[in-house]
Amino acid sequence: MTGKLHQLGPQTKIFLVIKAKKTLTPEFIKQQIGRAFRDLLGSLAVPSLAMPASVRGALGGADNQSAVASAMVHFGVTEADLKKVMAAALEKGGDYADLYFEHTFNNNVVLMDGKVNNCGANIDFGMGVRVLAGDQTGYAYVEGVTMEEMLRAARTAARIASSGKAGKSVGLTEKTIAKSRYAVTEPWEDVSVKAKIPYLEKLNEKIFSLDNRVRKVQASLSDSTSHVLFCNSEGVSYYDYRPMVSFMAVCIMEENGKMENGYAGRSYRKGFEFMTDDIVDIIAREAVDKTAILFKAVKPKGGEMPVVMGAGGSGILLHEAIGHAFEADFNRKRTSIFCDLLGKKVCDEHINVVDDGTIAFNRGAVNFDDEGVEGQKTYIVKEGILTSYLHDRISAKHYGVAPTGNGRRDTFRNTPIPRMRATYMEAGNMKEADIISTVKKGIYCDQFTNGQVQIGAGDFTFFVKSGYLIEDGKLTQPVKDINIIGNGPKALADITMVANNDKIDNGTWTCGKDGQSCPVTCGMPSALVSKLTVGGES
């Protein structure tokens, strides 16, 4: 039956959503619908939606000088148009204005019970205008790029942030980097659904082949491509091509009438070249291993005890419980517990915490943030000292420092705010086994799932899917379904040992804040927190 798994089942859901009003002609809409269904039937994707080859050629860094000009052609605007809209944005006295154009394609294919039962496509198109005047921010967006629509958005934003004296913009200068951090060789725009399905089939078959206890598998593949054109009243302009792929599986197993489930996935800023038999094998084995261990696991007794955070995925605790409190908007508003601690010691001197937008192909990587600032590596904590918050343009101006490249937004419908990218703790100088050997009785955390954090106080609760008991310095009984309860700043201060096995978790992490979602990653080496409350059996 494997030869027929690619066929659409009777319950298959097919979605095509085109979010771009007025500027899309009936002929354009018809073209997109035709493309979507030709994809589903297996033909090659029509390249008309792709960015021109002149821009794609620039993505590798060899020649990026024509990228903005080609992007203007793609969006149907000229430099004169941009200057006219910018002038309208500043006509009420704004200190600063920027224009953000976005054209995004999202695709998703899900295979369940050996059949494709969900196949969706989404096209998003529009632009937003932001105006800053003192402490005021005006923002408006339109789902189209006619001059009438852009001027309406610009004047709406200008009225919101008005100081009464017209501002001035300058000529545009293209901003480039030497080499894209996520140049692709096989763009998703050129890949049909038919070409993707075999990898879902292979993942499904591989998981079933690894363990006869497997009862159900859900395999899914999501890809997206965003074309972003940005310019501001300071003369900065750039074009960014942003690919993304997420490949994942949920595995359900049964043993003696008992059911368990596990998940594994990978996500990168890569094109179709990411899809290989090796990545299928990695995800399949991880999904099975994470599920199988749960049959042996027990719920431990609760209480306060030492906790060893495993390398990689434990970085979610660093991101959620501590990382958000380092974002500058929370500190500017004095809602973060770290608002008065800049330049002060917040943890042991062997700890360095970084937020990095420069890791090649990383889910959280940025060539430029959504305010025109080039991606960079920012030390939040250096040798135990809080050295920097994560800044957007507004917070950087407040603190009198340069932006850190953390001004990010969900879509053109949103204003940029300080957001993390790849947040991790750098390696220490100890071996993980040596750290574990110091613990008489405690918990080793392996898989984290969801959690809750109060940004102000820093209190958190995290659910640990699986881990191990530590008894007399050794990992013993697997454990599952436990809660870790603590306070972020205190937990950071209570880290007493850090291993040399630093690891970035390249899972499908997405961070939510103020109603916006952004792709991120996290990571850390194994580390000992001297005491946390573990919620288990009474």
Regions found by a protein language model. Give the residues of each.
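N-terminal small-residue-enriched
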Residues: 3-538
